[in-house]
From Swiss-Prot:
Region (Disordered) residue spans: 1-24
Family designation: Belongs to the thioredoxin family.
The protein, known as: Thioredoxin-like 3-3
Organism: Arabidopsis thaliana (Mouse-ear cress)
S-S pairs: 55-58
InterPro entries in alphabetical order: Thioredoxin-like_sf (IPR036249), Thioredoxin_domain (IPR013766), TRL33 (IPR044193)
Residues forming the catalytic site: 55 (nucleophile), 58 (nucleophile)
Pfam families, A to Z: Thioredoxin
PANTHER family from the UniProt entry: THIOREDOXIN-LIKE 3-3 (PTHR47571:SF1)
Function: Probable thiol-disulfide oxidoreductase that may participate in various redox reactions.
Keywords for this protein: Disulfide bond, Electron transport, Redox-active center, Transport
Start and end residues of each Thioredoxin domain: 5-126
């Protein structure tokens, strides 16, 4: 179930910008579309983490996602909060959802969290 009002998810990211690793944060729908267009046109491998500020599992995996972004430098890492980007993320049914892109196309999707599981999937796509 989606929460209709954001609870300040971006405040955490803005105040801790140095803690984001190599993760691009999409603060709104327009920014997310720009990032997604860049991923598709550059054909660089990428992973998008769709989460929510009110999702406990999302909050648990986000620090690992940030840390892993430094370890997998060939991948572009993106975080999109489903409440901050409601139009472009309306197809997301579970949080967290991770989508993997290669050559501009979505090639894989992972639901749920687990640092080792995420690491293994990132390794597979890097």
């Amino acid at each position: 179930m989606r929460k209709q009002e954001s609870e300040g998810a971006n405040l955490e990211f803005e105040s801790k910008s140095n803690d984001n690793g190599n993760v691009k944060i999409a603060p709104n729908d327009q920014s997310f579309l720009t990032i997604l267009d860049d991923i598709k046109s550059s054909k660089s491998p990428a992973v998008i983490n769709y989460g929510a500020s009110w999702c406990g599992v999302c909050s648990q995996i986000l620090p690992a996602f940030r840390k892993l972004s430094n370890s997998f430098s060939k991948l572009k890492f993106v975080y999109a909060d489903i409440d901050e980007c409601p139009e472009t993320t309306r197809h997301i049914r579970y949080t967290p959802t991770f989508q993997f892109y290669r050559d501009g196309e979505k090639v894989d999707e992972m639901f749920g969290a687990g640092e080792q599981r995420l690491h293994d999937r990132l390794w597979l796509h890097s």
